[in-house]
Amino acid sequence: VVLSMIPGKVFRRFKNVHAQNLVQTSISGASYAAANAMILPIGIPVLMGRPDLLIPVLIGVTLATIVDGFLIYKVFDSPMFAATNPFPSGIATSETILALANRGKRSLLLFVGMGAGVAGKALGIPMDLFGVSWFGNVVAMLAFAVGSIVKGSLIPAWTAAVSVDGVVPTMITYLPHGAMIGAGLVSLVQAALVLSKKGKKIQEDTTSERTVSMNSMRKSLGLGFALYLGIALLLALITGIYSEMSVGKLVVWIVFAAFAAIASELVCGLSAMHSGWFPAMATALIFLMIGIMMGFPHMSLGILVAYTAATGPAFTDMAT
């Protein structure tokens, strides 16, 4: 956008608002994918006392992010991930691009807001939250405010009054996690139901406007699962966790890690498509608990969580 304001023939092409929107979308998807799918997961082995595994895990989650991008391209506007469903539409970004393109009062107000943001941040004011609350839905912001007050003030006061041993506060702390896990399981069941539909049922539920058919989507997900199997095997080898397990348990871990990776995509993708939010932490927690019950060793569980945490958020952030 700034380049488009520079006089000259070379910079004229940047005046196209569609080009600006495409560039911004690419930058946004890449930024979120890098943060959620690459930088965040590599902290897990470090927190577990194995900083030497940072680079191997980074290699694995980077490959997983690339597969995520491939699958987004292949399944978007399919019966499961329809383009007509309410993905977050990025209205704020579009309005910003239009304001700068049209110049005038709206453009001036935008620069005033930018100046206020810089000044407020320099003074230590959380201007990013202020900006979000300004153009956010008033009902959603009110619900968030009430929830913050209840969690920060009322619940601690109540639990301190009724609990001496600290059991009640601990239980209440885990209630939101339980709610997210339940929501994640529902999304997984929804994905399974859509994938299990056959023949005439699919034709009744879909329209000719879909650019990706159910069969094509299934083939893409099958290819994605195969790629995730390969990445899981690579992770097991370069991180050394294969030495902690027997051959049989290693095979089970690889298959389970690939399933967790693609299931995380489906759960987070469906949640984001319908609500604009996704239970990435809950999804990773679900597969962590299942992995614990399956008896996987300590470090292999950490690699599993890092792998799972890389796929769902990347798929969702790049799609939205």
Roles of regions detected by a PLM:
Residues 1-320:
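Alpha-helical multipass membrane-protein architecture
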